[in-house]
Amino acid sequence: MPQVTMRQMLEAGVHFGHQTRYRHPKMSPNIFGARGKIHIINLEKTVPLFNDAMNFLSAVAQKRGSVLFVGTKRSARDAIKEEAERCGMPYMIQRWLGGTLTNFRTVKQSVARLKELELAETDGTFSKLVKHEVLRLRRESGKLQASLGGIKDMNRIPDAIFVIDIGHEDIAIKEAKKLGIPVVAVVDTNYDPSLVDYPIPGNDDAIRAVQLYARAAADAVLEGKAAMPNAAAVREEEFASAPDAGKKGRQAQPKKGKRASDAAAE
């Protein structure tokens, strides 16, 4: 599991919450106190919850599952894109499209259109079209790339989603909950941690904090992938654990023209 220390969290500003007047009552157990009018998050509570969340992501990846990284706010986009690409997972960094999960079949049609346009640009199709038509198709491709480029290779519903700001990504979380998809999310002092399966109490605005979360999530995924059982090893293990009768194979059949009793006597 990726090791992130309390000191690293302090240096990244994970402990700084929102203004005290915005406190959500259910976040109170995770709040240490206040400095001025800003709540201070208790990192002694954050660290074990953070570790639980990372262990879960690692377990998902180990079972060949996919994790959708979600961070559409400006402070999260770069880190989410970079780390999701590093660990080979899909991501969403532009405005969340309603129905991305709950209407995935339609989204896949839009993704197919994006791939079609990308192919047309590389295989010479565009060179056969008039200029204004090429410009129109490139604009269409650009819009699709901006909104769906991160999930272009996501062929099925993800096994989990990793979210930076549950208030900003409330639609994504509602869709995930509707489909029973586990949610790992950073939850600041102004939101309800019970809305997600694996809450991580922490600052959801500071760029350094977001980078820490995203990097740790990617490391957890890569660790899980590295621990995936080798397919050949699994087959060998299954064969070795088969009943002895299965190993012996079929009994020899009597040769043609001989009675079964004669064959047995031989």
From Swiss-Prot:
One of its GO terms (molecular function) is structural constituent of ribosome. Residues 233-266 are annotated as: Disordered. CDD domains: RPS2. Belongs to the universal ribosomal protein uS2 family. It comes from Xylella fastidiosa (strain Temecula1 / ATCC 700964). HAMAP family: Ribosomal_uS2_B. InterPro entries: Ribosomal_uS2, Ribosomal_uS2_bac/mit/plastid, Ribosomal_uS2_CS, Ribosomal_uS2_flav_dom_sf. Keywords: Ribonucleoprotein, Ribosomal protein. One of its GO terms (biological process) is translation. One of its GO terms (cellular component) is cytosolic small ribosomal subunit. This is Small ribosomal subunit protein uS2. Pfam families: Ribosomal_S2. Transmembrane segments: none annotated. Residues 248-258 have a biased composition (Basic residues).
